Amino acid sequence: MKIQRFSLWVLLCVVFSLTGCGYNTMQQAEERVFKAWGDVEATLQRRADLIPNLVETVKGYASHERETLEAVINARAKATSVKLTADDLSDPAALERLQQAQGQISSSLSRLLVVAEQYPDLKANENFRDLQNQLEGTENRINVARQRFNQAAEEFNSMIRSFPNSVTNSMLLHLKRKEYIKADEAAKAVPKVKF
């Protein structure tokens, strides 16, 4: 009887010590994912904030390029209307919606910059060059923020799936795997170069 009681006591101690393994670490890892996502959102917002100034500058020189300008404005409006919560980071469809909206911004900005190439006075405008440089820098920041988010998500996902953290997670936390930011379909296509 004493041996059974002792064995039960030892078993309970082992179970409770295992479930405590990684409890705080997993929560800290999830917070790193949320912080990394906040950085992605901040850089996307920076790009969205640059667009009105860029459009206004181009409009002064290329007012008859109305269709291109409206495409940029509409893409910006759509992208800023797509909001993700912390729970959405585990939802592949929600992340896909955001990525599609951001892809439309990138595409319309590319068309706008192609239009700008047709106007030498616009290209020579110091304000336009400054905005273009800021936009390029922001695109680089977006890429870095996405990479950092994916790294934080990978560390978190690995942590919640490995033993004994998986036991702790399934018994106490019920944290869900975070999705990765993936390249959009257009970026996956290999460009054809013809001379």
What is the predicted role of each segment?
Residues 2-195:
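A helix-centric hydrophobic-segment signal that preferentially recognizes long
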